Amino acid sequence: MRDPIETVMNLVPMVVEQTNRGERAYDIFSRLLKERIIFVNGPVEDGMSMLVCAQLLFLEAENPKKEINMYINSPGGVVTSGMAIYDTMQFIRPPVSTLCMGQAASMGSLLLTAGATGHRYALPNARIMVHQPSGGFQGQASDIERHAQDIIKMKRRLNEIYVKHTGRDYDTIERTLDRDHFMTAQEALEFGLIDKVVEVRDVSADESK
């Protein structure tokens, strides 16, 4: 059975742009990157994380002051891969606007709430899910104990990040993330994960850019 992601990538449309040097063809994602749009789509893993971080760093080099727009539709994934994206978002100089379309679960929700304050959005039918990290280990008892200690430290660190970006107190975050907690876009707004639920694009904001 073919990899569904590979199948989708083979169907990525090309767009043709007219320039004074003639025509130039781009795949649709490269063309959107020119508009400072990045997609975080699908499971968060090392390969995807590397590409997203590279795009963030490239856009910073292109213009260190102009906003970057990150569109998120992700079920989450590997914590360390997501943290690489998170740290890069905080590290670069341009503000990163985030928008959830579809879902932002697990690490996807952390990346959504990590956007620049006032610029974290969700479409009306988006779903957001937060929870504590999970994992499984096997081996010697002492190694299992060390892994357990490490994931507890990671849980604490993730809770602190949600506290920072939502304004909620630590105990509230810990209780909310104890089990899978699903939210509508409106509930995510009330919780502090996002700043606005958007139904249509703000045309006036686009015209002012």
From Swiss-Prot:
Stored Gene3D superfamilies: 2-enoyl-CoA Hydratase, Chain A, domain 1
Localization of this protein: Cytoplasm
Protein name per Swiss-Prot or TrEMBL: ATP-dependent Clp protease proteolytic subunit
Any single Gene Ontology cellular-component annotation: cytoplasm
Quaternary assembly: Fourteen ClpP subunits assemble into 2 heptameric rings which stack back to back to give a disk-like structure with a central cavity, resembling the structure of eukaryotic proteasomes.
Tree of life domain: Bacteria
GO molecular function: ATP-dependent peptidase activity; ATPase binding; serine-type endopeptidase activity
Family note: Belongs to the peptidase S14 family.
SUPFAM superfamilies, sorted: ClpP/crotonase
Function: Cleaves peptides in various proteins in a process that requires ATP hydrolysis. Has a chymotrypsin-like activity. Plays a major role in the degradation of misfolded proteins.
Natural source organism: Brucella suis biovar 1 (strain 1330)
EC number: 3.4.21.92
Disulfide bond annotation, renumbered to this chain: none
Active-site residues per Swiss-Prot or TrEMBL entry: S106, H131
GO biological process: protein quality control for misfolded or incompletely synthesized proteins
NCBIfam families in the cross-refs: PRK00277.1, PRK12553.1
Assigned keywords, A-Z: Cytoplasm, Hydrolase, Protease, Serine protease
Record's catalysed reaction(s): Hydrolysis of proteins to small peptides in the presence of ATP and magnesium. alpha-casein is the usual test substrate. In the absence of ATP, only oligopeptides shorter than five residues are hydrolyzed (such as succinyl-Leu-Tyr-|-NHMec, and Leu-Tyr-Leu-|-Tyr-Trp, in which cleavage of the -Tyr-|-Leu- and -Tyr-|-Trp bonds also occurs)
